[in-house]
Amino acid sequence: SLTRYDDILAAYKDVRNFSSALGVSLYFGQPQPDRSGMGRTMILTDPPRHAKIRQVVSRRFTPRAVAAYEGRIRQIAADVIDSIAEQGGCDFVVDIAARLPTAAICEMMGIEREHWDLMFTIANQTVGRLDDEYAMGRSGRETMLDAQAQASEFFVKEAEKRRRNPTDDLISILVHGEAGDEPLTDAEVIANCWLLMLGGQETTRNAISGAMLALAQHPAERERFLVNPSAPAAIEEFLRWTSPVTHIMRTAMSDMRIRGETIRTGDRVVLWNAAANRDEARFDHPDTFDITRAPNEHLAFGYGEHFCLGAHLARLEMKVMFEELVRRVSDIEIAGPIERLRSNFVAGIKHMPVRFVSNALPEPKPVSAA
């Protein structure tokens, strides 16, 4: 395990000696046979193949492209909040934090509204494979494989629709895209559809939920935040503080020594993002939640070749959601026990009851999110 910021940063940069191809999480010790029909996602590939797959969809996630989505993202956030604002309270995770990113990525992928609940369920079972609520008596491996099988069945059908009738959504871009000078394989298309659907939901959902909890637990910072909920520094501190993806795993491709410890070829090396983001050698007072922290070069989105493709989208969704919450809800407080996700990979909250008082607003608009 690597826990120091500088060591983790160096490993992220060194794609020659630290491979992603043999797994990126601690869920399973060794790669397992795949019964889902999926190929390799871009996060399970090394250069040069990784960059070739990534460039197929990357233009939809540039800062300029993401900025063009802001109006729609803001409308979704407003609809979500308006739909529950008069209820007096809700499960913040399920009713608010999850609905914006689920709706946004599904719309970008061209997934019809009737299937959004399925996408939410598949995401929960994938990241919550070790959690009893989502495993429902199955082993973690079986829960994961069942989720993959559901996703594969769905995206095979969606990909076939795009082959017959190309569109402008992300699924169609993958179906008709070329990685370098050759098309993606059918299995790669399905795998990367699943990855976009999963990644598009989880990081933002957990960052929004974790940020809301942090604001509730730190009243002074909450008051500062309410004065300027659009401050970029606050979003970066939310990400550092919550570290939604706790670790990323790599496989050593050569013998090496790090801080006096020997790492052999084939050893699994775990990069603990959450520890790096609290490293006192990098951050002043790292255990202090400070929404004005600067600089704040956290590793919540990783670094280098595998830097999170959706980082700009996640930041925008967080910014818009909190701006709309501040505008539409005058007060929010935790109203009951918080249930955390059982996972060593995702720092997630499953359920967080809150109570709130709504600001006076026009009649709610029709709900357009999951």
Residue ranges of model-derived segments:
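Cytochrome P450
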Residues: 1-370
